[in-house]
Amino acid sequence: MKGKSSVMEKLAEVVSLKLNKHLKMEGIELIKLKLGVEIIFINISKLAILFLVSYYFGLIKETIIMLAAFGFLRSNAFGLHAKNSIVCTVMSLLMFVLGAYLSKYLLFNNYMVLASFIIVNLLLFRYAPGDTEAHPLVGAKLRDKLKKQAVLMGMLLMAITLIIPDELIKTCISLSSYFEIISILPITYKVLGRRYKNYYEFERTIKQS
């Protein structure tokens, strides 16, 4: 993975330097530009791996649906991130390729969808949004706003899933919603040895300074 990271770093440096001929950035701003470009390239490479594997197994449609549903909820509920690119890629394959494969055999009907989303929305109301050490969600107003929006997104996704006639799509969306919920549960933080409610530490530091 060091070789891959080195390639990404070099590629990001080349692209950022070319961009900087027009942007004229210096110092910390140039470093931020390079890091931003590198993150984009890393995410593109992870998506490419995900789509290639799902295409190989004939699951591309299901994988895209699961990614879209997951991203829809995560945009406001947030949640844990993997600590490195390899773990992130492996977890993505497990969730969105293996999950897509399992969806073909589980096949949720509307009763199962309704029961699933009642649980999902209750857990969103209780635990969303989930933050990380690198991205603490500072401010009670912000967290309250994100919580309300996350529940609203959950309700909207439930309505869409109930309306969709295809049981395979219903199952893909439901499983993706479970995966997002898992990423915000306190037990998940505890099992993975990650700090929960990171904004506490951040806000306490601000008050002490």
Swiss-Prot record:
A Pfam family reported for this protein in Swiss-Prot or TrEMBL: AgrB
CC annotations in GO: plasma membrane
InterPro entries: AgrB
Location relative to the cell: Cell membrane
Bilayer topology: Multi-pass membrane protein
TM spans (from-to): 49-71, 82-102, 105-125, 149-169, 173-193
GO terms for biological process, alphabetical: proteolysis; quorum sensing
GO molecular function terms listed in the Swiss-Prot or TrEMBL record: peptidase activity
Main location (coarse class): membrane
Protein EC: 3.4.-.-
Record has Cytoplasm as a keyword: no
Keywords for the protein's UniProt record, in alphabetical order: Cell membrane, Hydrolase, Membrane, Protease, Quorum sensing, Transmembrane, Transmembrane helix
UniProt record similarity statement: Belongs to the AgrB family.
Record's function text: May be involved in the proteolytic processing of a quorum sensing system signal molecule precursor.
NCBIfam families: PRK01100.1 (NF002210)
Entry protein name: Putative AgrB-like protein
